[in-house]
Amino acid sequence: MKTSDYLKKYGVRLKKHLGQVFLSDDRIAKRIVKAADLTPEDVVVEIGAGAGTLTEELTKTGARVIAYEIDESLAPILQERLSKYPNVELRFEDFLKAKDVPEGAICVSNIPYNITGPLMEKIIEWKFKRAIVMVQKEVGERILAKPGKKTYGYLSVVVQTFYEVKKLFDVSRSCFVPNPEVDSTVVDLKRKPVDLDFEKFKKFVSMIFAKKRKTLKNNLKPFLSIFEGVDLSRRAEQLTVEEIVELYEKWRRALECSRG
């Protein structure tokens, strides 16, 4: 049965405020799952199960699947599609408020468009060892962007600091119900052995990108004494991830020393 048929069967009305766009092409779901290369020993977290197209393919691998879905009106569809699989657990809750996500799991998801930024931060916070996520094409470009590119910014830096990033493939808007206005991109993120305080780090990155066209000297004005001898004439968008981490460490150490 097609995704659109399931929606009609159970009279599900799409909720605009949730940005609901459901993957309807089984071939894309299979391609994503193949790229994940899952084993029965893996624990997989899916954010936004939707109508279950990707969820069903994930369960077929034998991995333990924990699927989050905020919209309980989709429960009948998900239960019909997944009832024969003992290795899937449905959690009807907001992933952004989740408290017991297993650390070191693998995230495989079609990320809800309206909360992509916060969800990417949660992926970092929960320390997923790998994440294969489908996002809006424009968001994918920002995640993958290199220094000097117009799309390089806060999201590029925070994701690339903690993950090796790689583009897998693009997905046409025609593969979704309803058809969104933009195409999507699937990206592969592999966790780096980085030990940084994410809350402090994202605060620093937000600060240096606060006014993107301004130089570091402008954006770091309250902390100029910390960076004495450092060239602050460039803009944040011109710095590599490694250079930003180096500046952050200098800032963090100085603040810790000042607090005793």
Curated annotation (Swiss-Prot):
It catalyses: adenosine(1518)/adenosine(1519) in 16S rRNA + 4 S-adenosyl-L-methionine = N(6)-dimethyladenosine(1518)/N(6)-dimethyladenosine(1519) in 16S rRNA + 4 S-adenosyl-L-homocysteine + 4 H(+). NCBIfam families: ksgA. The lineage of its organism: Bacteria, Thermotogati, Thermotogota, Thermotogae, Thermotogales. Keywords: Cytoplasm, Methyltransferase, RNA-binding, rRNA processing, S-adenosyl-L-methionine, Transferase. HAMAP family: 16SrRNA_methyltr_A. It comes from the Bacteria. One of its GO terms (molecular function) is 16S rRNA (adenine(1518)-N(6)/adenine(1519)-N(6))-dimethyltransferase activity. It comes from Thermotoga sp. (strain RQ2). It is found in: Cytoplasm. S-adenosyl-L-methionine binds at residues 23, 48, 69, 94, 110. The keyword tRNA-binding does not apply. GO terms for cellular component: cytosol. Specifically dimethylates two adjacent adenosines (A1518 and A1519) in the loop of a conserved hairpin near the 3'-end of 16S rRNA in the 30S particle. May play a critical role in biogenesis of 30S subunits. This is Ribosomal RNA small subunit methyltransferase A. Belongs to the class I-like SAM-binding methyltransferase superfamily. rRNA adenine N(6)-methyltransferase family. RsmA subfamily.
